[in-house]
């Protein structure tokens, strides 16, 4: 059962997509124009051209839908290499885009045409301060290295759940993670950051900078963060436990009523508790229809408290499984380690259509489940798709003034999105998927009774907009526009969640 569940999670979390370009497609001479840049780069910097294996590997993204067109990959060996590459791109009038693990799947990325990829893979490292209160993390560092390095030193911080995703990228959009109930979002941990601005200036910023507000929630729009210094914490609880329960889809209403009552508790879910759920095909559980999996995770115990699990046991799950271990086992239990399928490359399209919820509307859940099930059951080309509902604890997120950062959704309790995974087969299929994804999102939205759709920018499809990504309040939009005009007047950083 776990392996099948993990396969489903694979489609959700981080399936990869491969985009290679013809070897003849370049917009400047390798021998002439690139030489100008190469003379300014460090000896450890690298350049990959179309047609090479290195280029193909570096130019791989999570989703193959609307990918950037890259003509050369620069792999900086240090921060100054990023500076020189940005200056070179500006001089030549070339677009550029920095990426690390390349899990962002927003369709706006496809607007970068014939540009420079700044691949941060070599900028990787974790250095704990002598006093143990902070850690400096390089721009290309993956979450697993952060977690493992800190854990070995008796420390931890908030990171994303998936091991192969970068640490800094998610933080620029806020950043959800296992420990957010105690400490806030990933971005909330920042103490300072080194950032390369649109004009090629490398600067260090902290809370004294007006840009500090923006990079913690809308940071993709303002520069390339080459390193950050973040808060660390002593490990408070080494023990963790999980229980995974699989149900027939016919229980959808009862299940989400139970989640509301026994887990979410009107936004007062206990700090030590996390609840996720998936809608997914698991043939060994139901050969004909998608099922609902409820994942209940608890910190500081060897067995999840029966007060949380018993209400679900009474709903007659098809299967139950339990695991106990430490914080470093969480990714393994939910199937998102670096060796699991989510971190492998498949070439699939992987659009998501996120929406935050404060609570579940069980009837809306039923309506969405029926539509999703009809789309993915059996031999459907979408049968590897997944609908995920992430209910992290939120006390640490709510404890921080909602006006203090560009992350606008501190009062939301559930992060949800359907991931519709499929292999490329032309624009008509892409349009069909976009229609389905937005129908599913609209059902949940109508169930909330709200006017605006709050959408997590790190999961965004790209057809939303600044008000959905960064908050509908006029003061937020005005502040972002003002900072954009000041720091990036020419819109060089406008390919991911653009403000304008």
Curated annotation (Swiss-Prot):
It comes from Penicillium rubens (strain ATCC 28089 / DSM 1075 / NRRL 1951 / Wisconsin 54-1255). Disruption phenotype: Impairs the production of N-pyruvoylanthranilamide ans downstream compounds. Its EC number is 1.-.-.-. This is FAD-linked oxidoreductase chyH. Residues 1-20 form the signal peptide. The lineage of its organism: Eukaryota, Fungi, Dikarya, Ascomycota, Pezizomycotina. Belongs to the oxygen-dependent FAD-linked oxidoreductase family. Glycans are attached at residues 199, 266, 275, 383. Pathway: Pigment biosynthesis. FAD-linked oxidoreductase; part of the gene cluster that mediates the biosynthesis of the yellow pigment chrysogine. the NRPS chyA mediates the condensation of anthranilic acid and alanine into the intermediate 2-(2-aminopropanamido)benzoic acid. The remainder of the pathway is highly branched yielding at least 13 chrysogine-related compounds. The keyword Nucleus does not apply. PANTHER family: BINDING OXIDOREDUCTASE, PUTATIVE (AFU_ORTHOLOGUE AFUA_1G17690)-RELATED, FAD-BINDING PCMH-TYPE DOMAIN-CONTAINING PROTEIN-RELATED. Residues 65-235 form the FAD-binding PCMH-type domain.
């Amino acid at each position: 059962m776990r392996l099948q569940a993990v396969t489903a999670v694979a489609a959700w979390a981080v399936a990869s997509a491969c985009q290679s370009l013809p070897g003849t497609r370049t917009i400047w001479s390798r021998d002439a124009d690139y030489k100008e840049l190469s003379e300014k780069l460090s000896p450890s910097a690298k350049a990959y051209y179309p047609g090479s294996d290195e280029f193909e590997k570096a130019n791989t993204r999570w989703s193959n839908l609307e990918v950037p067109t890259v003509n050369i990959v620069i792999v900086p060996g240090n921060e100054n290499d990023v500076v020189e590459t940005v200056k070179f791109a500006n001089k030549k009038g070339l677009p550029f885009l920095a990426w690390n693990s390349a899990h962002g799947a927003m369709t706006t990325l496809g607007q970068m045409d014939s540009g420079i990829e700044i691949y941060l893979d070599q900028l990787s490292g974790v250095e704990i301060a002598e006093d143990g209160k902070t850690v400096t993390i390089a721009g290309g560092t993956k979450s697993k290295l952060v977690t493992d390095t800190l854990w070995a030193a008796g420390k931890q911080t908030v990171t994303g759940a998936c091991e192969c995703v970068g640490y800094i990228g998610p933080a620029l959009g806020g950043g959800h993670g296992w420990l957010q109930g105690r400490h806030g979002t990933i971005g909330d941990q920042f103490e300072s950051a080194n950032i390369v601005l649109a004009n090629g200036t490398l600067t260090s910023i902290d809370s004294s900078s007006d840009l500090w507000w923006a990079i913690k929630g809308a940071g993709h729009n303002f520069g390339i963060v080459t390193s950050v210094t973040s808060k660390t914490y002593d490990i408070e609880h080494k023990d963790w436990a999980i229980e995974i329960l699989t149900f027939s889809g016919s229980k959808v209403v009862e299940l989400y009523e139970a989640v509301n009552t026994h887990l979410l508790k009107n936004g007062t879910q206990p700090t030590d508790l996390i609840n996720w759920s998936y809608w997914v095909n698991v043939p060994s559980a139901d050969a004909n229809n998608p099922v609902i999996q409820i994942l209940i995770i608890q910190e500081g115990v060897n067995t999840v408290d029966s007060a949380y699990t018993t209400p679900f046991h009474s709903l007659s799950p098809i299967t139950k499984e339990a695991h106990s271990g430490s914080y470093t086992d969480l990714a393994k239990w939910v199937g998102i380690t670096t060796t699991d399928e989510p971190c492998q490359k498949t070439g699939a399209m992987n659009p998501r259509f996120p929406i935050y919820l404060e609570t579940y509307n069980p009837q809306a859940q039923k309506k969405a489940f029926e539509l999703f099930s009809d789309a993915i059951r059996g031999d459907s080309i979408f049968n590897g798709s997944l609908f995920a509902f992430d209910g992290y604890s939120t006390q640490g997120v709510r404890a921080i003034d909602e006006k203090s950062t560009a992350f606008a959704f501190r009062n939301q309790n559930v992060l949800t999105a359907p991931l519709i995974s499929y292999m490329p087969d032309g624009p008509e299929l892409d349009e069909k998927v976009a229609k389905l994804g937005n129908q599913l999102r609209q059902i949940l939205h109508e169930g909330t009774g709200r006017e605006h759709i709050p959408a997590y920018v790190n999961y965004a499809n790209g057809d939303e907009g600044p008000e959905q990504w960064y908050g509908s309040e006029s003061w937020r939009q005005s502040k972002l526009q003002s900072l954009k005009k000041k720091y990036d007047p020419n819109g060089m950083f406008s390919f991911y969640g653009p403000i304008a």
